[in-house]
Structure formats: structure tokens, C-alpha cells
């Protein structure tokens, strides 16, 4: 069995519902603990026992492969009993409300619930009805805190810092919980954030979040240290936000020509899943400047760190 972590960081919150509300100290503590798990996950023995005897329920109202499997693996490596609830075959499909589901689950005394929901704010509502800790695995276009944390860890490991870096977040900012959480985190940590998108994919008043706004890639990528592409989320679109996928790629898809607008040592990120040929070219996605595969690796480490940090607040921990 692997040794205990050196970090003694305790997150001063019962839940992780978003990046909003986290201090720079909180974020740094989670990233430092995550670093330990990066190294652990590269060893033969990846097990720890910090969640032994604890129950983790993964409740996903939206389909997910990466995030759900990452949380499942994280919980199991920490020794938790992990249960994945299938919404498609549950009482929710039979008309049970979100609050009814929360009350029912709470009666089973889970220690940690990992929840994804299509409605912004739904995870926070559920958290009010349960006794255990709740982790927001994505709620509508609101927040996705563990994605922002894993992105920050990836950047810090490759650039050595977050403060002072120019981060260009490009694409469907309007519908992206990843963009919102990253903006909040990066601003807190002193990065310079720029969003790049057509006007139809920019939230009204986005400047009030403390970001620069560019409406073309040449301007947006100029001097960027990190180019973070976002998926075009057609499932959240009820109108015509872009003329066509091919035209969108022509102006806002990341190819080698547009990447050259950024710094020569700029690195490329994408939260996945990627629409190749829509928001990013395969040559760039699979190229030497891409951190996309590393982001997946960092995801497991970050989720292990979050689970452990919250578990330290649980009764009898």
C-alpha cells in the first residue's frame, strides 16, 4: 500500500460546488496535493486508504465518459466504495424530482456525492438536502471546478507558474462551464485571461469577469502562453450561433497557421471531447505543443486530491 500524503492541506469548505469562493490558498493547496497524486499514479501501487469505509456516489444526469470514469478511478484508488447511478434506469426517469432523489440518497448515508446536472445551480440545490460532501462535476453552463483545477495543474507543471501568463480561451464561451471556472481560477491566481470568440458565442457583459475580449484569432492569440480551445456545444444551442462547422473552423478553429499568432513556446489545451476539424485541427491536437493527453492524466490526480481534501472534513475523519 502506498505511503500517506505529505500535504496536510484541509479544504475549508464542506462541498466543492465551484471555483467561486475558493481563495488562492485553497487553489494552491489543492494543486500541491494533486502533485503528490500525479507521482502516486505513475507507480505500480496506486492505492491509498484515506477513503476506506467511505461511500462515494457518482450521480450523472448528463452523459459523461471522461469525468465520470476519472472520479470513479479516483475514488477506488483512495479505497472508497464507489457506486455509479444510471439516471436512464433510475426513478428520475419515472418522474422523481431532483429533491426527492437527494432525500432518497441521503437516507442511504453516502459520504461523498459527485453530481453532474444539465441545469445551472442544480448541484447546489441538491447539496442543501444531503449530509455528506458534494462535488460539482458540471452544472449546465455554470461551473466545472475540477476541470479548471486540472487545467491549472497542467499549466503549472509545464510553465512553472500561473501568475502573469497570458491565457487565451477560445470558442464557445457562451455555453461553457469550463470557461467560467477557468476564468475564475486564473484570475484568482494572477493570470491574464483573454476570451476569443464570435460575438454570438460571447456571454453579455463577459468583460465584467475581468477578461480581455477578442473577436478574431489573430488578435486573441497574440502573445498567448496558453491556447485553450473549447468544444462547440451544439446540444446547448437552440438557434443558429454559427453559420456552419466548416465556416467556424475557417475563422475560429485552431490550425498551425493560427497557432503561429501565439508565442513560439505556446501550449495547446482542450477539455475534451474534441470536435476535430471544427474547433481544432488534428495536426495541432496531436502535435508537440499539445497538452491534451496530459490533461486527462492530471484529471485523476486532481480528483483524488479533492476527494481527500473533503474527506478530511468528514465526521470521524
Curated annotation (Swiss-Prot):
The keyword Lipoprotein does not apply. PROSITE patterns: CARBAMOYLTRANSFERASE. InterPro entries: Asp/Orn_carbamoyltranf_P-bd (IPR006132), Asp/Orn_carbamoylTrfase (IPR006130), Asp/Orn_carbamoylTrfase_sf (IPR036901), Asp_carbamoyltransf (IPR002082), Asp_carbamoyltransf_Asp/Orn-bd (IPR006131). One of its GO terms (molecular function) is amino acid binding. L-aspartate binds at residues 94, 177, 231. One of its GO terms (biological process) is 'de novo' UMP biosynthetic process. One of its GO terms (cellular component) is cytosol. Carbamoyl phosphate binds at residues 66-67, 116, 144, 147, 272-273. Its EC number is 2.1.3.2. HAMAP family: Asp_carb_tr (MF_00001). Belongs to the aspartate/ornithine carbamoyltransferase superfamily. ATCase family. PANTHER family: ASPARTATE CARBAMOYLTRANSFERASE (PTHR45753:SF6), ORNITHINE CARBAMOYLTRANSFERASE, MITOCHONDRIAL (PTHR45753). Heterododecamer (2C3:3R2) of six catalytic PyrB chains organized as two trimers (C3), and six regulatory PyrI chains organized as three dimers (R2). Catalyzes the condensation of carbamoyl phosphate and aspartate to form carbamoyl aspartate and inorganic phosphate, the committed step in the de novo pyrimidine nucleotide biosynthesis pathway. This is Aspartate carbamoyltransferase catalytic subunit. It comes from Bradyrhizobium sp. (strain BTAi1 / ATCC BAA-1182).
